[in-house]
Amino acid sequence: FRHNKSSTNEKGQKVPKVYVVNRPTRNKFGWTPDLSDAARYGALEVVFEPNDQPQFVPAQAPQAREIMKDFSSEDYLLWPGGGDPIAVMICCMIASEKAPTVRVLRWERNMEEGERDRRKGWYMPVALELRK
């Protein structure tokens, strides 16, 4: 799910995108985050791949800017965890340049028998008004 070129629906309306900061990989808990629930908010578009290191490869920041060139207040940012923390910062800065309000998808874990199960849950949208 990278570089989805279709940005309008059959009625010609802009379809929101979910910009995934980095493609999920197996985490320290031994499982890979499932982004299927995030797809209900829009087409998934990966910004950074697992081997990308924008902290050490300056050319990757302009690549992210190109991928996110059409980011708007109707779109979402999603960080699935892991990856280069600088990638998160780059995506947030690009999003804030493009839109006064940045919507993010936050993972809400299910409560099961008093404990939160990291593998089960849903994405909750949060709007961050960064400027008026």
Regions from the PLM with identified roles:
Residues F1-Y76, M89-K132:
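Long, low-complexity, Lys/Arg-enriched
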